[in-house]
Amino acid sequence: MQRALPGARQHLGAILASASVVVKALCAVVLFLYLLSFAVDTGCLAVTPGYLFPPNFWIWTLATHGLMEQHVWDVAISLATVVVAGRLLEPLWGALELLIFFSVVNVSVGLLGALAYLLTYMASFNLVYLFTIRIHGALGFLGGVLVALKQTMGDCVVLRVPQVRVSVVPMLLLALLLLLRLATLLQSPALASYGFGLLSSWVYLRFYQRHSRGRGDMADHFAFATFFPEILQPVVGLLANLVHGLLVKVKICQKTVKRYDVGAPSSITISLPGTDPQDAERRRQLALKALNERLKRVEDQSAWPSMDDDEEEAGAKTDSPLPLEEASTPPGKVTVPESSLITLETAPLL
């Protein structure tokens, strides 16, 4: 153990040295608030449902609750989550987008958690749910990071025996936390934070995240139903589509838009905002393969032309005049057919 600690410290120092300012700042704030908890009561930094809403309105807790920890093992989880996000997500998104993602997930977890406990109080009239419950910690952001990893590298294998892929880790951890809660080994705010972190991060990445291809990610492998076992996916997908249709009617979400960019008669480019580049590349390869097979069949059928066909083609070439457009085109210039944009709205697979 004593031999492993220096190596772990050196490895952690190397990771933080190469990290961005955002990752370093988040780690520093987590450590500072944990050390501060030994000197003063930091409960005012956690989200307390009875104090978040009027008349108290502790709005600052939405920004601080995700960075406040009270145990050393929770601090380790927070630091590991931030470092993993910096190593795997920041190169894809950038430091600013990672900070936006962190803020969106933590604010959503605080609001949804406080609202859930407020509704629980209204059903039970138990003041514990208003003034004793404290929502804090990085479990909400951990859920968001796992959802983002499912989006970007869902096919990667985490465990080989038994084989576990990144795409199933979010729900596996949710099931584990649920079992710990049923065994009274885990407090309810931790389970609520992780669950709302999963939900809020998926909604943001699915519909609202801005990138070079538009907004959101409407890829089939990132649908809401894919978080569940295959036997439940049809039912979950149906319910998710009903909810999405309702949100579209109330103008909270927008319909999926497919854009067909027709650049020339020989090629058509189809772009769906938010689709995975790997899916697009795979479909393009399949389309090219089908096109090559069709061209090969056409060449085989026309391999032995008849003499009559040759004479007709020769007569057509000698009798037909040059096209007016080609004759009027100045040397060195090539006319390119104008492209048009066709926009279709389709219902997404949620």
Curated annotation (Swiss-Prot):
Gene Ontology cellular-component annotations: Golgi cisterna membrane; Golgi transport complex; nucleus
Could you tell me which Pfam families the record lists for this protein? Answer: DUF1751
- The stretches that face the Lumenal side, renumbered to this chain, are 41-97, 148-165
Topological domain (Cytoplasmic) residues are 1-19, 119-126, 187-350
How the protein sits in the membrane? Multi-pass membrane protein
- Spans annotated as Mediates homooligomerization: 1-205
Region feature (Disordered): 299-350
Region: Mediates localization to the Golgi, residue numbers: 206-229
- Transmembrane regions listed in the UniProt entry: 20-40, 98-118, 127-147, 166-186
Query: Is Ribonucleoprotein included in the keywords of this UniProt record?
Result: no
- Which keywords belong to this entry? Golgi apparatus, Membrane, Phosphoprotein, Transmembrane, Transmembrane helix
Q: Name one GO biological process term.
A: retrograde vesicle-mediated transport, Golgi to endoplasmic reticulum
User: Where are residues bearing Phosphothreonine located in the sequence?
Assistant: T329
Q: Which GO terms describe its molecular function?
A: identical protein binding
Known role: May play a role in retrograde transport of proteins from the Golgi to the endoplasmic reticulum. May indirectly play a role in protein glycosylation in the Golgi.
Assembly, in brief, is: Homooligomer. Interacts with COPB1. May interact with LMAN1. Interacts with the COG complex; probably through COG3.
Q: What is this protein called?
A: Transmembrane protein 115
Q: Which gene encodes it?
A: Tmem115
